[in-house]
Structure formats: C-alpha cells, structure tokens
Design a protein with these regions (language model features):
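Bacterial N-terminal signal peptides
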Residues: 7-15
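Generic beta-strand/beta-sheet core signal
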Residues: 41, 232, 273, 354, ...
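Short active-site loop at a secondary-structure junction
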Residues: 51-71
Length: 477
C-alpha cells in the first residue's frame, strides 16, 4: 500500500516537472523579462493539470470583470435594472408645478440624452409648463470620488476611463474637431457641437507641415471645473480636422446642463435654480422614468466588449445594494469580497480589489484565486448563464481577432475574458478540448516589453506563445 502511494506520488511529481518544463519552453517565445503565472484545471477536478506560479500575485486587468459580473449576478440578480426618474413632492395647478423637480440619477451607464428628452416630454404631457421651484440633480445613490484609487492620471480624460458617476449621459463622452490654423504659429481652433454642454479652449500651436518639432510637441488636455477643458501642444498643418474625444469629468454638471436645455426646448420654464442634491432624501411622486436593459444583458456587453463604464457602475451599485449605503469604491470592494465568501464559497484572501473594471493598478490577484471563481461559474452555469457572456475566440468581443488562439486552432473552443494594460496580456476562462473536456485556465502575463524599434511587431512573441500553449492544451487534454 505504501509502495503504491509512493508510485502515485512519484508519478505526480514527474507530471508536474514535465508541466514546468513545457511551460518554460513556451516562455522562451516571450520577450526577455516577461513574467508568467499560469493555471489550467479541468472543471470539477480537485487538482490542476498545469500549475505554474499559481500563487503569484498579478494585475488582473480586465479579467477583474469576471469577478464583478459574478458578484453582481449573486447580489443584484439577472433582472436588475438601473432606474432614472423625474420626481416631485409638489402639486400641479393650472400647468404650474408648485415645488422642486428632482432628477434622480441611478447610475445607468446606458442612459442617453434622448432618454432625458423622452422623460421631459412625459412631464410636459402631464400638463406641466412651468416649475415654481428648483431643478435638483440627485446623485445620492453614489458618494465620494468617481475615480477609483490607482487609476493612471493620464487616462482620466480618455473616454474608456470616463468616471462612472451617478449621473451618466451618453457614456459621459463627447467629441470635438481640432482645426489647424491657416498660418503656422497661430493657434489651432476647436469646434464643439452645441449639444455638448462643455467648454473647450485651445492653446494648440499650428506647426508647418513636416515640422521636426511635431515629434516631441504632443497634444494634451487639461480638465478644469464644470467641464471646462484646455487643449495644449502642437498640431502640424493639415487639410482635414483632427477628431478627438474626451471624458466628462463632472457627471452631475453635465447631466444638469442637458436637462436644463431639454426643459427649455420643451417650453418648460422654472423660477428657481439648478442645484445638485447629494444627500439621500425621501422619494417623491415619479412623473417620468427610464429603466436600463436587464443586468444580464448589460453584463454580456461588459464582458464581450470589456466595457469599463458598465463594470464600475455595477461595482459601486453592488456596494450600495449590499450595505444600503451610497455606492463607493470601498463599499463595492467589501461587498464583492463578502458575497464571494458567503454565497459562492470563494475566499479571495489577500486579493486586492480596488475597482470593478480592472483599470486600477492597485488590483492584485493570484491565478489560483481566479481559478476558484471560474470553477464556481462552471459548476453553476445552468443558473448563472455566465459562460455564454464571455468573448468567444474567433467569433465576437475582444477574442474575435486574437491571433494566437486562431493559430492554435481553437476558434469557437475558447470562451474567456481578456485583460490588457501596459505590459499586461491576460486571459481567464474556459477551453473545450479535442476530447470534449471543459477546462478552466488563467493566464497572467506581465512585464511584457519590447525595444522601441520593435513596437510595430510587439505582439508577435505573444502570438507565438499563445498559439503553442493553447494548441497543446487543446490537443493533449
């Protein structure tokens, strides 16, 4: 009996040694200095098929969205909807609303200006033509900063990093056109569509075509209060305008200006002022409302397209719903940790969760922890309907054109979430092997860097690495 146990143990050691040797061969495809933590395990199995630094902490990047989605489904449920309302505690007399109009924003990441227009139209149809009171922008569902700890400061004005505020309209992103001046040395000028309630100032100097100075004189944007932006730097002369897009920094101010304009366009006047309401108040009578699509539909978009805005509003909403407090980053983090431990049996230990999207550089997680999450998802997928929300290699989302997986011949066989930051290329999800087995895998690859001269072909080593790795996983399990 002891001898048989010794043989089994020896066989396991040999297997793991072979695994490590094989993984080391894959790593030779990567740029020098790259760090890999990898874990592959059959769904329902007690031991991994590949365990390579699975306890090593790493930046999850957008694989964090897998955790956010699971916690959201458990806490909020697949049918949850974000709700935006127009409310009042006043009465309507002869077309005059005697009291304040409250626009209660519920952090709907999909709310559009047209939705606000429709709600105002409903208000008008109810007989209101004048408001004898103030217009309040209620953002009390969230509190504290709208930007998570650890977000790179230079990404703050990019639309993919738009602050997930309580008040969001058209993803809190706006577009402008930058025109070079006819004469070199003069300031370029900016055109902003009138329906964007923002102010842009140009301090951009126009350079002659082909100017050597353009290489190091870059465009930059400096945000100010109340969605005022200053564009600085240089722009070589060009015949066509340069299209640019920026993230709104003050969601409440932006939404308030849009509501103010829509009331004006509808012919509804008011005697008071536009104010922000941040303290929780008793709701009034709802006169108009807009609901988002069901949560499951939003999570599918979030996972397929790696939508940061949805991820972070959902994350903050989880904290709000779990603890009945305004949604903050800390509340979201504590709620996710508690939900996974108490309702999914997943103890994430010393994992650091700073946001829901994975944009924060403060996030840290080990592949072994993410593997626990994936195993729970796979074993409860009948009720969660989760795996179908993940990008499918070769077909949709962020895996549609993943060259390494295509070369590995696993199009349609891999459902996984991608995660990319500077020097980070992650994957976490599932592969159906040639024998029909479903295996979960976590690939955390960081420290990926190439020489400046090789930037154009920087992904070639990644393609080689992933094509060999996933081809072997597919064929040999």
């Amino acid at each position: 009996m002891r001898f048989s146990r010794f043989i089994i143990g020896l066989t396991s050691c040999i297997a793991f040694s072979v695994q490590a040797a094989n993984v080391d061969e894959y790593i030779t495809q990567l740029p020098a200095g790259a760090n890999l933590a990898l874990m592959v395990q059959k769904v329902g199995a007690s031991a991994p098929a590949i365990d390579y630094h699975s306890q090593q902490m790493a930046l999850p990047a957008s694989t964090q969205k897998v955790i956010t989605a699971l916690a959201a489904l458990i806490q909020l449920g697949p049918d949850f909807r974000f709700t935006t309302t127009l409310e009042t505690k006043g009465n309507v007399e002869n077309g005059v609303l005697k009291g304040d109009l409250v626009a209660r924003f519920g952090a709907d990441p999909t709310l559009k200006r047209q939705d606000i227009r429709n709600m105002v139209a409903t208000l008008k149809k109810s007989g209101v033509t004048q408001i004898d009171g103030n217009v309040l922008i209620d953002t009390s569902i969230f509190a504290s900063h709208d930007k998570a700890p650890g977000w790179p400061w230079n990404d703050m004005t990019q639309c993919f990093s738009a602050p997930p505020a309580a008040a969001i309209v058209d993803r809190n992103c706006f577009s402008v056109s930058l025109y070079s001046a006819p004469k070199p040395g003069d300031m370029a000028f900016i055109r902003v569509a009138s329906y964007y309630p923002v102010t842009m100032f140009s301090q951009v100097r126009t350079l002659p075509r082909g100017s050597a100075e353009a290489q190091y004189c870059e465009l930059d944007v400096v945000p100010g209060d109340l969605n005022r932006f200053t564009l600085t730097g240089c722009l070589p002369q060009r015949s066509e305008p340069l299209p640019l897009a920026f993230a709104v920094q003050d969601g409440a101010s932006y939404a308030g200006a849009i509501l103010k304009d829509e009331l004006k366009q509808a012919g509804i006047t008011w005697s008071g002022t536009l104010l922000r309401q941040t303290q929780v108040n008793e709701p009034g009578t709802v006169v108009a409302s807009k609901q988002s699509a069901p949560l499951h539909d939003l999570l599918k978009i979030m996972l397929k397209k790696s939508d940061n805005m949805i991820a972070d509003t959902v994350f903050r909403m989880i904290g709000h719903a779990r603890f009945n407090v305004p949604g903050t980053w800390r509340a979201g983090s504590d709620a996710v940790r508690q939900i996974l431990r108490q309702q999914a049996g997943v103890d994430i230990g010393n994992t650091i969760i700073a946001d829901g999207s994975g944009l924060s550089r403060h996030n840290l997680i080990a592949p072994a922890t993410m593997m626990q999450v994936l195993q729970y998802i796979a074993q409860h997928d009948n009720e969660l309907n989760f795996i179908s929300m993940l990008p499918l290699a070769g077909y949709d989302g962020s895996l549609q054109y993943r060259a390494g997986l295509h070369q590995a011949g696993v199009d349609g066989k891999v459902s996984a979430k991608t995660g990319s930051l500077q020097g980070v290329y992650n994957l976490a999800g599932f592969i159906t092997t040639a024998s029909g087995q479903r295996m979960a895998f976590v690939q955390y690859l960081s420290g990926y860097a190439v020489e400046p001269a090789d930037q154009r072909n920087r992904r070639i080593p990644l393609v080689r690495f992933e094509s060999r790795l996933y081809k072997d996983i597919y064929q040999n399990n």
